């Protein structure tokens, strides 16, 4: 048990290079609920479930390439249907895909699609209903289905 008792998370922040482009990506494509911009207009709040995500426009754009630390990412839980829909939509929109992983063991099991937002932040869509022994189609096979 820690010294302090944290009662919850107010929000998570994601640094972005272009706030308007990122608002469209997270709101229109990923379907997060827009809550509005903060008073300073360089931060925009989105909600999903019990979580608030704050998009923070960087003062200077940062180039984040696929070679960046792949362990740092934000993960979103989706249904199997949304997972397939996302694969097809990302392919059609040429959203950069990093990896498709089928994780049968560990703390977070399921199938995981890693991709990048317009600012180069690594994101994950996770379908927790997939389990070891189920089919493991490649990304291209899911897109073609």
Predicted regions and their residues:
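Vicinal oxygen chelate
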Residues: 1-5, 8-17, 47, 64-89, 92-145, ...
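Short, flexible, solvent-exposed loop/turn segments with mixed acidic/basic and small polar residues
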Residues: 2-3, 62-66
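Conserved beta-strand in the GNAT
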Residues: 54-56, 124
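Core segments of cupin and vicinal oxygen chelate
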Residues: 14-54
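Residue-level structural signal for beta-strand termini and adjacent loop
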Residues: 40, 58-59, 128
């Amino acid at each position: 048990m820690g010294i302090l008792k944290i009662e919850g998370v107010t929000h998570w922040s994601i640094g972005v290079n272009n706030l308007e482009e990122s608002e469209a990506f997270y709101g229109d494509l990923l379907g997060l609920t827009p809550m509005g911009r903060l008073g300073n207009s360089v931060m925009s709040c989105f909600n999903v479930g019990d979580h608030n995500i704050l998009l923070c426009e960087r003062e200077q754009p940062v180039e984040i390439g696929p070679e960046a630390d792949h362990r740092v990412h934000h993960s979103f839980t989706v249904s199997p249907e949304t997972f397939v829909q996302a694969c097809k939509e990302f392919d059609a929109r040429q959203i950069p895909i990093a990896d498709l992983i089928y994780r049968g063991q560990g703390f977070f099991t399921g199938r995981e699609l890693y991709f990048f937002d317009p600012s180069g932040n690594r994101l994950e869509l996770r379908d927790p209903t997939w389990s070891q022994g189920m089919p493991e189609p490649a990304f291209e096979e899911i897109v073609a289905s």
